[in-house]
Amino acid sequence: YIGIVLTKTLVIIQNIFPMINIYFIFLVGTYSISFSAFIFLLRKRKCKIFLIVIILIIEFTLLKYFTYSVVAYLLATSGVLLLYKEEKNILSSIIIFVGFSLRVQVIVSVILLLFGIVLYEIIVNKKKKKTVYLAIVTALVIATNFIFVKTNSEVENYITWNNKSTLIRDY
């Protein structure tokens, strides 16, 4: 399921514009934002044209797997890389928040996937403060979802049911 803050925001926008598929526009927009962030990060690199071509090939290849989970991974990853490589703490925090909120279940795997980068940035580049930002954003997503689920019995029952039905369907 999608994180509660993002869900509520999208529902409000969808209610304002009922004839427009806000969810699809949001998904395409965030997909584009994530790859724009990757390309932005390459602007100072040598061989940037070659790297941009590779990024674009990956972008078009991933269109075949255009899902909330893939976009969540892309957004969160691009946000983390922006956080450590640029002085754009607010923008990168928003991108990470939206990425983790888009598919809450990807948080652990994104952290594991980027663990080496985070560790490197802490040890070599001494970017402990940025790691605290990352931890705060992650905790914020987890906390808002946890609080909402625990205070809304209908949602809690649905999530319990959905988790059990997913176990049956996945095996």
What is the predicted role of each segment?
Residues 78-91:
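Membrane-interface transmembrane helices that cradle and orient dolichyl/undecaprenyl
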Residues 28-46:
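Transmembrane-helix motifs of polytopic, lipid-linked glycan transferases
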Residues 131-171:
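Juxtamembrane membrane-water interface segments immediately following transmembrane helices
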Residues 109-139:
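Perimembrane helix-loop-helix junctions
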Residues 42-48, 85-88, 121-132:
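Membrane-interface helix-boundary motifs at transmembrane edges
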Residues 57-59, 90-106, 115, 138-144:
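Membrane-interface alpha helices of multi-pass inner-membrane proteins
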Residues 52-76, 101:
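Aromatic- and kink-enriched transmembrane "portal" helix at the membrane-lumen/periplasm boundary
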Residues 1-30:
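Short hydrophobic/aromatic helix or loop-helix immediately within or flanking a transmembrane segment
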